[in-house]
Amino acid sequence: MSKSRLTVFSFVRRFLLRLMVVLAIFWGGGIALFSVAPVPFSAVMVERQVSAWLHGNFRYVAHSDWVSMDQISPWMGLAVIAAEDQKFPEHWGFDVASIEQALAHNERNENRIRGASTISQQTAKNLFLWDGRSWVRKGLEAGLTLGIETVWSKKRILAVYLNIAEFGDGVFGVEAAAQRYFHKPASKLTRSEAALLAAVLPNPLRFKVSAPSGYVRSRQAWILRQMYQLGGEPFMQQHQLD
């Protein structure tokens, strides 16, 4: 290898190492800070806002109103657990059985990819990472997930998730969603309303809370059944999530 190539390689390696250190400090600081402080915005919110501006849409505002778990109906927490991650109270950030099932499904159905992200993983990637699919992103997501699972309580993870989740175009967080779609605070959401909000989470830009399709209504009904099978509100109290 020539001297010039070695110089370039050495420069790139030093740059990447320094970048990794900076990102580790930034993300580590974020995990520590948001273990107690309200989250003002997420990476997804920033990405959506910048994308809107680049497309000339200056009316778009990624809106979110932070509320504590005490200000969120327990039905809402139960609904997202029933819909997205029923093992949330027990796992350490990853649902290994669901990952294995998703991998087996994706091998058989290459055109219908199934995910297996837990609420902890979704919180990590929505809060800190860019949109997209890559092994690099997955690796960073895994590290961040372990970080928040180590530092945050399960109740804190659920609170952050509910406050940064996307429920529609420009609608982030359960308080903004409750006000937009039901004209009430998140604390007053009913079991049915919570299930409807959770039903659009796989793709909130495609599925609409304001105009639910047959699929969304079917998913809402399924979530309601799962909420009942989990034990209803006592489930949240049992796992200290309310």
Swiss-Prot record:
Recorded topology in the membrane: Single-pass membrane protein
Annotated localization: Cell inner membrane
UniProt keyword Magnesium, yes or no: no
Its EC number(s): 2.4.99.28
GO CC terms, sorted: peptidoglycan-based cell wall; plasma membrane
SUPFAM superfamilies: Lysozyme-like (SSF53955)
Protein name in the entry: Biosynthetic peptidoglycan transglycosylase
Organism: Escherichia coli O81 (strain ED1a)
Lineage of source species: Bacteria, Pseudomonadati, Pseudomonadota, Gammaproteobacteria, Enterobacterales
Gene name linked to the record: mtgA
